[in-house]
UniProtKB/Swiss-Prot annotation:
Keywords: Amino-acid biosynthesis, Arginine biosynthesis, ATP-binding, Cytoplasm, Ligase, Nucleotide-binding. Pathway: Amino-acid biosynthesis; L-arginine biosynthesis; L-arginine from L-ornithine and carbamoyl phosphate: step 2/3. It catalyses: L-citrulline + L-aspartate + ATP = 2-(N(omega)-L-arginino)succinate + AMP + diphosphate + H(+). This is Argininosuccinate synthase. InterPro entries: Arginosuc_syn_C, Arginosuc_syn_N, Arginosuc_synth, Arginosuc_synth_CS, Arginosuc_synth_type_1_subfam, AS_cat/multimer_dom_body, Rossmann-like_a/b/a_fold.
Length: 401
């Protein structure tokens, strides 16, 4: 029987390494795909490991700039904080991984794609809904969900088949990291009463260890896109990396969150998102300066829906595309510079300026330079309050009757 081809989203960890052998036993030729999303791993090693375990071909693709400009940027502009806390670190990367899986599958003539998600997480939904949206004819295989092995059984299978066991297997934590941040779950973190141990963190310093003097950074934006730090131009991916280091040094971006998962359970996770939280804070302040009131008040409703769609794996849905079109329209004048103070876990905006600023000091001031027409207030109040006045008059007459 001729073997079918499957493209596997490969991380180099135990699950996806075991999945290569498991898929071989199902009569598949495996093409491994590993993406560089800015997590800082030795991906050349991961690429070679896939081949050594049994893949017939192994891809390693650097998608950092694509991820920054087409995914993280939208999240920043939409101030996406799921349940007011989580900046969608993992949720943002899944549609891009799905997109690349489909592209390689079509390029290689594969009939299926595979991922390493379990049956109780959000990522299985995000991957499979995205893949269906991009190519509904591809079969999707989820080995970890199908084999239902315990961790001990999986390790035994790996040893039987000479699959290398990762040296960090004894770590109690399950970690996912990319440019936009780092998520951490499992181990002691599963107890919502337990304080996260310091070893759960990597991108940020504990407040006790942060500098005792604040650091100031000026972030330049052009049409809603961060382009400079302290006057130096960066590509977006490099800007995010640089700001991760700057803000992380001051303990910015630690998040401890009990969240409501898409699959119906609550999960306690610890996130580190120094650049994401700093950029979202700065961008919001620049919008406050440049957006008209009606747009500024309506946009949070769009942001909330976009956040839900992205978290739930609906990146490629028609509604997400429509809402994104609105989002991009709002960014045309979001150009300027924001000064942020980084200190003891906080990113505090202390100044903002823009050539498109709608703040007019001559109208806002209470000094002798005031140019606001105070006489216009009387007529405005009369008209603005007229419906309330009429309502009160009508109901007062009924009471008197």
């Amino acid at each position: 029987m001729e073997k079918k081809k499957v493209v596997l989203a490969y991380s180099g960890g135990l699950d996806t390494s075991v999945a290569i052998k498991w898929l071989q036993e199902k009569n598949y030729d495996i093409i491994a795909l590993c993406l560089d999303l800015g997590e800082g791993k030795d991906l050349a090693f991961v690429k070679e490991k896939a081949l050594s375990v049994g893949a017939i071909k192994s891809y390693m693709i650097d998608v950092q700039e694509e991820y920054a400009n087409e995914y993280a940027l939208i999240a920043m502009q939409a101030h996406t904080l799921y349940e007011g806390k989580y900046p969608l670190v993992s949720a943002l990367s899944r549609p891009l991984i799905a997109k690349k899986l489909v592209e390689i599958a079509e390029q290689e003539g594969a009939s299926a794609v595979a991922h390493g998600c379990t049956g109780k997480g959000n990522d299985q939904v995000r991957f499979e809904v995205s893949i269906q949206a991009l190519n509904p004819y591809l079969e999707v295989i989820a080995p970890v969900r199908e084999w239902k092995w315990s961790r001990e059984e999986e390790i035994a299978y790996a040893k039987e088949n000479d699959i290398p066991i990762p040296i960090n297997l004894d770590s109690p934590f399950s970690i996912d990291q990319n440019l936009w941040g780092r998520s951490n779950e499992c181990g002691i973190l599963e107890d919502p009463w337990a304080a996260p141990p310091e070893e759960a963190y990597e991108m940020t310093l504990a407040l006790e260890d942060t500098p005792n003097k604040p650091e100031f950074v000026e972030i330049g934006f052009e049409a809603g896109v961060p382009t400079t730090l302290n006057g130096t131009a960066y590509s977006l991916s490099e800007l995010i990396k640089t700001l991760n280091a700057l803000a992380g040094k001051h303990g910015v971006g630690r998040i401890d969150h009990v969240e409501n998962r898409l699959v119906g359970i609550k999960s306690r996770e610890v996130y580190e998102c120094p650049a994401a939280m700093t950029l979202i804070t700065a961008h919001k302040e620049l919008e406050d300066l440049t957006l008209v009131k009606e747009v500024a008040h309506f946009k949070p409703m769009i942001e909330q829906k976009l956040t839900e769609l992205i978290y739930n794996g609906l990146w490629f849905s028609p509604l997400k595309q429509a809402l994104n079109a609105f989002l991009q329209e709002t960014q045309k004048n979001v150009t300027g510079t924001v000064r942020v103070k980084l200190f003891k876990g906080h990113a505090i905006v202390e100044g903002r300026k823009s050539e498109y600023s709608l703040y007019d000091e001559k109208l806002a001031t209470y000094t002798a330079q005031d140019e606001f027409n105070h006489d216009a207030a009387v007529g405005f109040i009369s008209l603005f309050g007229l419906p309330t006045k009429v309502y009160s008059q009508v109901n007062q007459k009924k009471v008197e009757a």
